[in-house]
Amino acid sequence: MIATNLAGNQVTNFVKQYAEFGLPYPVVGFNLNTADAWAAGEGNLGGIWPTVWHHELQTQGSKTFVANFQKKYGKIPENHAWIEYVSLMMLAQALKETKSTDTDKLIAYFESEAKFDILKKRPAYFRSWDHQLMQEAYPFTVKAKGESKGKQDFLKFGEAVPAPDQPLESLAPTRAESDCKM
């Protein structure tokens, strides 16, 4: 097994070159944005990868976001578009709830572990002690040859992790395991 810890176009370049060399070992990574996966192209990408969001997510919020994005821009949103959208939604919620733009008040609000609808099945929150966003993630692999219907349809998304009966914090180090101090 080959494990990578690359980001952005480094991942895209790596998977294209890996496919070119025809190496037989499975590849896994720690993050892959959908736009980078699409850029790698069908036939180049393999293995198992995580992502924070994808356009096939079947929640009402995600379906509405995808439909509105497609109507306005004429294409499927990749997860960076979702990140930008929900980041602004979270900030708007904090501004509304605190009725303030004061930095200390906003930090206190985020540290309160307020819940945010980020268009997934479960709400997200920022962990108070390290500011880590606790949220679901999604594994994906590549569809079998001939299954895809287009350039952006060759990824096969799995169920959310952690499982619905597991706490979101099970994806992150505990306070005892972490050196992060905020």
Predicted regions and their residues:
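Extracytosolic ligand-binding ectodomains
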Residues: 1-182
